[in-house]
From Swiss-Prot:
Organism for this UniProt entry: Picosynechococcus sp. (strain ATCC 27264 / PCC 7002 / PR-6)
Keyword Iron attached: no
CDD domains noted in UniProt: bS6_chloro_cyano
One Pfam family matching this protein: Ribosomal_S6
Stated name of the protein: Small ribosomal subunit protein bS6
Lineage per the UniProt record: Bacteria, Bacillati, Cyanobacteriota, Cyanophyceae, Oscillatoriophycideae
CC per GO annotation: cytoplasm; ribonucleoprotein complex; ribosome
């Protein structure tokens, strides 16, 4: 049975744009190779953290939505934990279909005059 998942991970802020793309594509490939489908990856950019993580005050946020049976999560999270690029990660099982990411969302209709 295929479930919807959302994974958010935070990369070190000192990574270059090429390194961010490399890490992002690495985890996307890992998920695809293990049977995940409908992958949507969005780099949210560098943001200030609410509290320091591993002595970093900023981090690069990446969000991944996908469908999978759940067996992929353990391998991906193990790689994130052992690697040095990811400073924090979280995977959540979604009850409903994920909301379209901003880049994939259709343009909103303008409000009707006088409404």
């Amino acid at each position: 049975m295929s479930n919807n998942y959302e994974m958010m991970y935070i990369l070190r802020p000192d990574l270059s744009e090429e390194q961010v793309q490399e890490v992002s594509s690495k985890y996307k490939t890992m998920l695809q190779d293990s049977g995940a489908s409908d992958l949507q990856v969005q780099v949210r950019g560098k943001r200030h953290l609410a509290y320091p993580i591993q002595n970093f005050n900023d981090g690069i946020y990446i969000q991944v939505n996908y469908k999978a049976d759940g067996s992929q999560i353990k391998a991906v999270e193990r790689d994130m934990r052992l690697g040095e690029m990811v400073i924090r990660y979280l995977t959540m099982k979604l009850d409903a279909e994920p909301i379209a990411l901003e880049a994939d969302a259709p343009p909103s209709e303008p409000a009707a005059p006088g409404a």
